[in-house]
From Swiss-Prot:
GO biological process, any: positive regulation of DNA-templated transcription
Name used for this protein in its record: Mediator of RNA polymerase II transcription subunit 16
Entries under Pfam families matching the protein: Med16_bridge, Med16_N, WD40
Subunit relationships: Component of the Mediator complex.
Source organism of the structure: Xenopus laevis (African clawed frog)
GO cellular component terms attached to this protein's record: mediator complex
Length: 697
């Protein structure tokens, strides 16, 4: 584990240099980081609570939102798509922020809810029923469906037809649970209910979900002598109103409080976290005093309830069916640690079967198996999520500026700089921390936790995680932190091999993702950087092709035949004539009729296609030079076939509106440039054998 980079903001006056409020941060699946700060005016009377959005790939470009929260922001939560963000404050107000036009630097407040005057201590989006499991045991198989299996999991609430209903759930300090549901028409249904009849103060809380569609809420009043309470929450819609039902579940006392030797040593519970949002059976607890902490991991299990002999004698049949009860059992506990300041849990849904854990241990594949603890002395430690045994450590001294004199640090009466907020990336290969000075640090977490591995094993680990991001659509920037320049070529080749082993339908779905993934990988090495522009050009070509084909409409509605775009592809592949007009007469030209203003608005895209075809044909004599942009296109039959289809489509549109055609400078006024380019392009396309016609090279 080491430092990737540190972001330092503009210096503030000493009185407001250190943030006066607890910092909150959240990491989305798009590798966008949201975090909060408070901003004082010159008189230091009014405080503005800001939300900052930062792209980890461009940390120098931070977008700040004036949240409008009058009180301190206590919670931030991204949705599963990474395009919406929830913020909640100490006044009970919850706001939902959404991207404007899919831009990471443009956000607006969409909807919201409030529990007036009741601070929010826990917040979560409702579960959408989508859950994957990564099987390390099957990392060597070819099928993505076996590597990343779909786990049966019910949404928290469903609409007609089983579609998951969107919304969020929050827990307040006074023991209330509030649920807001987003209806398809934009209406918000909100309901509030007490977790139990006897309401009590809630200092810490967390939310998790069960496979049956229920919600589990864990609460604690902050005292280690008090029990940690658990509640089952069921949400439903009755007569267009949101209804909440709660039920008390078994509670637990931390083991450190039941040990006579340590009964009063750790008076406060400082952290309460479920190990995963969709794993309500395991919880992490941390108790602390002024100087030290202790962490415990608990698991909820079904156990048989022993019956008294009297009941067994009265009814022998009863003894055959032993009643089962739910009971919390401690899995592991740490020794006395430095005082914990922040906890980060893994988001990677790795399978925790005995076989998968054994294979992960043998191959030194640890993403998803470790959780991070930040301490008040500035250190950060990764511990195993089940055994709580140390796996890696980063000392706080490596985070301090090297130019700062050590004597100055020793004499400083101020507390040591440490992280107040900590979050893991979605592949568990990076950490983000916000310290007491407001600095943001990105830390690299090695997949092997520092163990030395041979090159093939390291490539297999990174390939497995890249495949996971390809299947889920998550951003893979944090994986690139661990890719060395010498790995790029082999990684790209192996990624392409695994992609081509999938069925045709899945390849079509993943075609653009693997292009984007290869482009980002090739940027990391000087030997492959020239291929980056080819991948971006292919992405742009696919986008233009999909856009233009989507404008076509069948002449007769409700026809069971193929769509016009599919027929265009079929005809162009079937007729290999070099004469564009002979290919065009086999199409139903009435399907290509568009409005004149629409055709004219496409002229810029049409011009790009024409220029690109011209560039490829001009560079054909230099095809032996692999460093020239466009080199891979000359051997890519599928991309050349797509260009042929676009040329035929443009030819038809040119008959309707000649001004939309691409403009060329010809040597003769009578020369048909479109026909000439199509003839040369077709000859080049025919040189690509059918078994080499693929979209990705």
């Amino acid at each position: 584990m080491d430092v990737a980079y540190i972001c330092e903001w503009d210096r503030r006056p000493r009185t407001s240099h250190c943030p006066s409020i607890p910092l909150v941060c959240a990491w989305s699946c798009r590798n966008l980081i949201a975090f909060t700060t408070d901003q004082r005016n010159e008189e230091e009377k009014d405080i503005t609570n800001l939300i900052h959005i930062l792209d980890t790939e461009h940390p120098w470009d931070v977008y700040s939102i004036n949240s409008g929260h009058q009180e301190v922001i206590t919670c931030l939560e991204w949705d599963q798509s990474g395009s919406r963000l929830l913020s909640a404050d100490a006044d009970g107000r919850i706001k939902c922020w959404g991207m404007t036009d899919h831009l990471a630097n443009s956000w607006q407040n969409l909807v919201g809810s409030e529990v007036d005057g009741d601070p929010i201590v826990a917040l979560s989006w409702l579960h959408n029923g989508v859950k994957l499991a990564l099987h390390v045991e099957k990392s060597g198989v070819s099928s993505f469906g076996e590597k990343f299996s779909r786990v049966k999991f019910s949404p928290s609430l469903t609409l007609f037809g089983g579609k998951p209903m969107e919304g969020w759930i929050a827990v307040t300090v006074s023991g209330l649970v509030t649920v807001s549901l987003l209806k398809p028409n934009g209406q918000v249904l909100t309901a509030t209910e007490s977790l139990c009849r006897l309401r009590c103060r809630v200092a810490l809380a967390d939310i998790a979900f069960t496979g049956g569609g229920n919600i589990v809420v864990a609460t604690c009043d902050g005292s280690s002598t008090s029990p940690v309470q658990f509640y089952k929450v069921c949400v439903s819609v009755v007569s267009e109103k949101c209804k909440i039902d709660t039920e008390i579940l078994p509670s637990l006392f931390m083991r450190c409080t039941t040990d006579p030797a340590r009964k009063d040593k750790f008076p406060a519970v400082t952290h309460l976290k479920f190990l995963a949002r969709d794993m309500s059976e395991q919880v992490l607890l941390c108790a602390s005093n002024q100087c030290s902490s202790i962490a415990e991991c608990w698991s909820l299990r079904k156990e048989g309830l022993p019956l008294n002999n009297i009941f067994q004698q009265l009814s022998p049949a009863v003894s055959d069916k032993q009643p089962m009860i739910l009971k919390w059992r401690i899995l592991s506990a740490t020794n006395e640690l430095e005082r914990v300041s922040a906890v980060a849990l893994p988001k990677l849904p790795i399978s925790l079967t005995n076989t998968d854990i054994k294979v992960a241990s043998e191959t030194k594949f640890y993403p998803g198996l470790g959780l991070a603890l930040a301490f008040h002395d500035g250190n950060v430690q990764i511990v195993h999520r089940l055994s709580l045994q140390p796996m890696a450590v980063l000392y706080g001294s490596s985070l301090r500026p090297s130019e700062e004199p050590s004597l100055k640090r020793q004499r400083s009466p101020t507390p040591c700089i440490h992280f107040k907020a900590l979050q893991m990336s979605w592949t568990s290969l990076a950490l983000v921390g916000l310290d007491t000075q407001g600095k943001l640090s990105i830390l690299r977490v090695s997949p092997s936790m520092g163990h030395s591995l041979d090159m093939s094993t390291s490539l297999r680990h990174l390939l497995f995680l890249l495949e996971y991001c390809m299947v889920t659509g998550y951003d893979w920037w944090d994986i690139l932190l661990h890719v060395q320049p010498g790995m790029v070529h082999n990684l790209v080749e192996k990624l392409n091999e695994e992609y081509t082993r999938q069925n045709a339908a899945l390849q079509q779905v993943l075609s653009t993702r693997i292009l984007a993934m290869k482009a980002s990988l090739c940027k990391l090495s000087q030997t492959t950087v020239t291929r980056v522009c080819d991948y971006h050009a292919k992405l742009f070509l696919i986008s233009i092709s999909c856009t233009l084909k989507s404008l076509l409409r069948p002449h007769v509605l409700n026809t069971p035949d193929k769509s016009p775009g599919d027929r265009l592809t079929e005809i162009c592949n079937k007729f290999t004539d070099t004469d564009i007009d002979k290919v065009m007469i086999n199409l139903k030209t009435e399907e290509f009729v568009l409005d004149m203003p629409t055709l004219q608005s496409l002229q810029q895209l049409i011009q790009w296609l024409g220029d690109f075809v011209l560039y490829l044909l001009v560079s054909l004599p230099n095809q032996g030079s692999s460093v020239r942009p466009g080199h891979s296109f000359l051997r890519d039959g599928a991309s050349l076939g797509t260009l042929r289809e676009m040329m035929v489509m443009i030819r038809i549109w040119g008959l309707l509106k000649p001004s939309c055609l691409p403009v060329y400078t010809a040597t003769s006024d009578t020369q048909d440039s479109m026909s000439l380019l199509f003839r040369l392009l077709t000859r080049l396309w025919l040189c690509c054998p059918p078994h080499n016609q693929r979209l990705i090279t």
